[in-house]
């Protein structure tokens, strides 16, 4: 059996995925692309969290002990926390659920592309907006057949954009599981 690739052509992925399943996944992706998850950080940018992050990363930069946060901490302020869960409007988690239900149970973070517009300062309150950027597949990989799912997150202080990130994961059927 052939599978349908993203461009509508056929590829030889040994019958792992039938065209109807692919079409359902891509239709769900189009619906999910309309979702926008907007979340406000539970805490302001603060020195104790910066200090803990610096210690964990082994960074000793006086700049970050004087009221500025490392740019790479942008995501830290809006994470769900240890007991937190993504809501139904979270596009990345919604797409991951669709793929899990279709049998793509493996997950592997592949890469992220980050851009920092400015340093955050202690006392600022950050918010993030997240959307599904793209889904590509099915692709045969060393891990198994899967889809690459990319989300786009943009962080703001007030109306000012301060950082953005493309985050890509591979959601796959582990080899030998099919």
Functional labels for PLM-detected ranges:
Residues 2-30, 111-178:
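HotDog/MaoC-like acyl-thioester-processing domains
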Residues 2-111, 178:
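Hot-dog-fold acyl-thioester-processing enzymes
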């Amino acid at each position: 059996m052939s599978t349908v690739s993203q461009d509508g052509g056929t590829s030889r992925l040994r019958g792992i995925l039938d065209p109807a399943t692919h079409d359902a996944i891509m239709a769900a992706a189009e619906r999910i692309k309309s979702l926008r998850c907007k979340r406000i950080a539970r805490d302001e940018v603060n020195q104790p969290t910066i200090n803990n992050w610096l210690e964990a990363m082994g960074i000793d930069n006086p700049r970050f002990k004087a009221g500025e946060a490392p740019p790479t901490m942008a995501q830290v302020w809006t994470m769900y926390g240890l007991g937190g869960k993504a809501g139904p409007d979270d596009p990345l988690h919604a797409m991951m659920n669709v793929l899990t239900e279709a049998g793509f149970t493996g997950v592997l973070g592949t890469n992220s592309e980050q851009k920092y517009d400015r340093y955050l300062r202690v006392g600022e309150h950050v918010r993030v907006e997240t959307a599904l950027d793209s889904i590509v597949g099915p692709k045969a990989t060393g891990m198994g057949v899967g889809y690459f799912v990319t989300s786009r997150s943009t962080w703001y202080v007030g109306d000012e954009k301060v950082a953005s990130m493309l985050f890509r994961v591979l959601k796959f059927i582990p080899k030998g599981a099919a």
